[in-house]
Amino acid sequence: MPPNNSKYVLDPVSIKSVCGGEESYIRCVEYGKKKAHYSNLNLLAKAILAGMFVGLCAHASGIAGGLFYYHKLREIVGASMSVFVYGFTFPIAFMCIICTGSDLFTGNTLAVTMALYEKKVKLLDYLRVMTISLFGNYVGAVSFAFFVSYLSGAFTNVHAVEKNHFFQFLNDIAEKKVHHTFVECVSLAVGCNIFVCLAVYFVLTLKDGAGYVFSVFFAVYAFAIAGYEHIIANIYTLNIALMVNTKITVYQAYIKNLLPTLLGNYIAGAIVLGLPLYFIYKEHYYNFERSKRDNNDAQMKSLSIELRN
């Protein structure tokens, strides 16, 4: 427990390029608290934009991976090259989300939940933010799947083996996702959102652009190449797979994958990461709040949240 006379000054002009653990936690809580003040329309617009970015880069990743899924090339380099290229392309989505200040449900499971733990967000506001965020992400991802991926014919089954590698790559990914058991899917979703929430935490911890890119890229690359399950990415992938008539059903997509993935992602952010961080740093946040009151809110004027929304 920190001493009672601890003072916390969050200085955006500091020469430090990395925040300490206490400051990172405070920034994360303040970031989550800020979301509760947005209007429903603002939240929805940000969430739709984030869902669209996930769809944009999932489409690009599918095309990139599909290029190496060409049957003759696959015989030489193996299917693992497609997975490597897929994982290497997908992190661009999270860089787009960070740079535009859009709103991703999976990151909110950590930041907004910690603000709830600190009683800086009311339960009804918490439910409002999380619901609108998830709904907006869904609308953005599915809209992109239909208006770009489906209407462009990028993943259409052309019934010619030498031209069908994009469809086959998508089909194989979708089939693998819907054939996990419930427990397997939840576990893979927990692993995924640990990386995603850490990517958010990295951005709040680091104070330079190169650090953002480097840390976010490898955090997201790790979950993408490991085959973890991300609810918004899966919403795009499984819906475009349904649109182009792959070998999966609506029941498999929504009940066997999306439902347990949603549960696992939430557990990772709210419980696996959120609770330990809260118990470790709650006294530091209490002292920060007390310092803010003692100094007539002077400390808050210097608070800089790098992940702007």
Swiss-Prot record:
One of its GO terms (cellular component) is plasma membrane. The keyword Transmembrane helix applies. GO terms for biological process: lactate transmembrane transport; nitrite transport. Pfam families: Form_Nir_trans (PF01226). Residues 20-35, 164-179 dip into the membrane without crossing it. It comes from the Eukaryota. Changing residue 230 to N: Abolishes lactate transport. It is a multi-pass membrane protein. The keyword Metal-binding does not apply. The expression levels parallel that of the L-lactate dehydrogenase and the glycolytic enzymes. In contrast to human monocarboxylate transporters, is not sensitive to p-chloromercuribenzene sulfonate (pCMBS). BH267.meta inhibitor attacks parasites at the trophozoite stage. Inhibition of the protein leads to a build-up of lactate and swelling of the parasite and infected erythrocyte. PANTHER family: FORMATE TRANSPORTER-RELATED, FORMATE_NITRATE FAMILY TRANSPORTER (EUROFUNG). Belongs to the FNT transporter (TC 1.A.16) family. Homopentamer. This is Formate-nitrite transporter. It comes from Plasmodium falciparum (isolate 3D7).
